[in-house]
């Protein structure tokens, strides 16, 4: 059995950034395992621009952004395996994988970084009524067909869900000559970034219908029409509000789910809100030496944030490999309440964390003219006003190690939404 200091499951933006960071922090024995035929992950099919503004201070396409991190990995001589599927990860950091060249094989790692990304919610998970004809795709599948395979999924399109991929595909299909009839969103707010709503829908006069969902799909061999209806506060269709659209394609952009089947096999505890691992300030899970970063941890808005998080995971994994398990330190829980759905990380160690720590979270509804309040126990520490907050846009709070040191008896940190 081969042994490595660090094994990274996933060769997308998170895995690449984590590998480069670990190498820069003194770890030479690294293996990246990627199930696709090339490194780069989902970025290879994201040919639109908007990437890299935070990381490189310039606007790049997805493949351009990926290529920069691929070059970092190649320049550092980091080993990787393509077309290789990880089958199991054990709590003692034994990774079982398989490919055509090696068959099924095992590698033993001193530390493992989970960077598997996320998957789209399928039609089966949505329980959409109607027939099951050809022409129903997830937005990501349609994106791959158009941008990488050179196939056009359809000519008249209805999109269910206003996640970022759905919004971007509304624009992409329009640019390729299709007619996007409508984008329907179950919730009373969009699930995507405000800039994508403006650039992908408003600029192309594509209607967005909030609080609407698909109630029927017509067609036996191919989609012929889709009926949408308004939903009430209980998210159930309101009779008499149905609208029928003739179309040959239905795209689904109804949320992303972190790919954590392997995490479960290792015994990693998952957050029921994010469906991703519960981590501390070093992005370490409840299993010693297993770290998580990127969309497998929680779904991000920007790949730049994924790279920042993954670089931190790589550095922290390197420290673990060189120094062993960190000494037992006081653990403080971060509590998300009053409009805050979750926080990443969930736990911090005030004496062991970096000088500053970014805590990222999402709100549960649209808030206007409110503030993000941070409490140490019951004492208000900071209150930052925000004109608008929405579930589609990630928020953050910066914790200062020096400030935390002033509260040696701290038992909890609370982050909540309050009136400004």
Q: Language-model segments: which ranges?
A:
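FAD-binding core/adjacent interface of flavoenzyme oxidoreductases
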Residues: 1-9, 67-156, 232-240, 251, ...
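Beta1-alpha1 glycine-rich phosphate/pyrophosphate-binding loop at the start
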Residues: 4-68, 72, 144, 148, ...
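A Rossmann-like FAD-binding core segment of flavoenzymes
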Residues: 68-97, 174-261, 355-387
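Predominantly flavin-linked oxidoreductase catalytic cores and closely associated redox partners
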Residues: 104-105, 111-208, 213-222, 289, ...
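FAD-site-proximal beta/loop scaffold in flavoenzymes
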Residues: 114, 136-146, 249-300
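Mid-to-C-terminal Rossmann-like scaffold of FAD/NAD(P)H-dependent oxidoreductases
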Residues: 304, 312-384
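Exposed aromatic-hydrophobic patches
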Residues: 360, 392-404
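Short, aromatic- and glycine-rich surface loops/edge beta-strands on solvent-exposed regions
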Residues: 372, 402-420
């Amino acid at each position: 059995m081969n042994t490595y200091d660090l094994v990274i499951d996933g060769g997308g933006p998170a895995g690449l950034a984590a590998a480069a960071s670990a190498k820069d922090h003194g770890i030479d024995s690294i293996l990246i395992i990627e199930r696709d035929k090339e490194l780069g992950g989902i970025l290879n099919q994201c040919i639109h621009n908007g990437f890299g503004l935070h990381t490189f201070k310039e606007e790049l396409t997805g493949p351009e952004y990926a290529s920069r991190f691929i070059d970092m990995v190649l320049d550092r001589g980091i080993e990787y395996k393509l077309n290789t599927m990880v089958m199991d990860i054990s709590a003692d950091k034994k990774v079982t994988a398989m490919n055509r060249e090696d068959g099924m094989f095992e590698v033993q790692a001193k530390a493992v970084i989970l960077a598997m990304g996320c998957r789209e919610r399928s039609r089966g998970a949505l329980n959409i009524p109607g027939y099951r004809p050809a022409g129903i795709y997830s937005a990501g599948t349609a994106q791959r067909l158009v941008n990488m395979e050179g196939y056009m999924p359809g000519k008249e399109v209805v999109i269910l869900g206003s996640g970022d991929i759905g919004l971007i595909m509304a624009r992409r299909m329009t640019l390729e000559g299709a007619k996007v009839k409508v984008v329907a969103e179950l919730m009373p707010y969009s699930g995507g970034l405000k800039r994508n709503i403006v650039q992908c829908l408003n600029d192309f006069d594509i209607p967005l219908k909030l609080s609407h969902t698909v109630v029927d799909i017509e067609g036996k061999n191919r989609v012929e029409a889709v009926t949408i209806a308004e939903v009430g506060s209980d998210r159930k269709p309101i009779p008499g509000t149905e609208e029928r659209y003739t179309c040959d394609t239905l795209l689904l952009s109804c949320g992303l789910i972190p790919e954590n089947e392997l995490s479960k096999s290792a015994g990693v505890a998952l957050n029921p809100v994010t469906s991703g691992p519960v981590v501390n300030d070093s992005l370490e899970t409840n299993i010693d030496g297993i770290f998580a970063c990127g969309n497998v941890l929680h779904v991000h808005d920007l790949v730049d944030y994924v790279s920042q998080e993954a670089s931190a995971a790589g550095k922290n994994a390197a420290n673990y490999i060189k120094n062993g398990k960190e000494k037992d330190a006081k653990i403080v829980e971060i509590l998300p309440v009053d409009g805050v759905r979750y926080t990443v990380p969930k736990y911090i160690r005030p004496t062991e964390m970096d000088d500053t720590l970014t805590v990222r979270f999402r709100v549960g509804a649209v808030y206007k003219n409110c503030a993000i309040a941070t409490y140490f126990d019951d004492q208000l520490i900071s209150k930052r006003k925000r004109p608008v907050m929405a579930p589609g846009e990630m928020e953050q709070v910066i914790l200062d190690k020096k400030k935390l040191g002033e509260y040696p008896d701290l038992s909890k940190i609370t982050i909540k939404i309050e009136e400004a």
